[in-house]
């Protein structure tokens, strides 16, 4: 069985945050702490290796850990961060979570590790209704396929899943894990609920 210590986890903070008015979501405060700090607090007891993918405000993010940017400069969305994470992480298995989901399960890493089989390439969280493609675990052997995928301009993650041995991890008992805060209104509402 894959152990959590054999994985690295990347917090994806490289997006443009257009729905948040262009403000860097990971650095926006929720209850007096940046969103990324909430994610780190949930993730750090689960894994010794946390990295941050950010394409701006890198000095601010360095306060929280090792930071790297996308290698594809045309912002191919989370796929650019996943690609860069596979390049920079030192482990064969690399997990990914978004910077704007402050309620990540405290057993998220363990669930992913328990679901790995010998031939698994990609694991994706599933909430019972939908796949959650930014809550995912990749084996580094996917990197050549992902590089080719991005170089030809593909952006639909489902196409990559079809090229790889992809399985899903059941989180239907934990829908709050996937609450992400995309707008100032969602942030304000969540802050009131969580205060």
From Swiss-Prot:
Q: Which SUPFAM superfamilies match?
A: Nucleotide-diphospho-sugar transferases
Q: Does the keyword Transferase apply?
A: yes
Q: Name one GO molecular function term.
A: GTP binding
Name of the featured protein: Molybdenum cofactor guanylyltransferase
The residues listed in the UniProt record as binding GTP, with positions renumbered to this chain, are 12-14, 25, 53, 70, 100
Instruction: List its EC numbers.
Output: 2.7.7.77
Question: Quick one: which residues bind Mg(2+)?
Answer: 100
Relate the protein's function as given in its record: Transfers a GMP moiety from GTP to Mo-molybdopterin (Mo-MPT) cofactor (Moco or molybdenum cofactor) to form Mo-molybdopterin guanine dinucleotide (Mo-MGD) cofactor.
Q: Report the domain remarks.
A: The N-terminal domain determines nucleotide recognition and specific binding, while the C-terminal domain determines the specific binding to the target protein.
Q: What is the annotated quaternary arrangement, including any partners?
A: Monomer.
Q: List UniProt keywords, sorted A-Z.
A: Cytoplasm, GTP-binding, Magnesium, Metal-binding, Molybdenum cofactor biosynthesis, Nucleotide-binding, Transferase
HAMAP family assigned to the protein according to its UniProt record, in alphabetical order: MobA (MF_00316)
Its recorded reaction(s) are: Mo-molybdopterin + GTP + H(+) = Mo-molybdopterin guanine dinucleotide + diphosphate
Q: What Pfam families does the record tag this protein with?
A: NTP_transf_3 (PF12804)
What domain of life is recorded for the organism? Bacteria
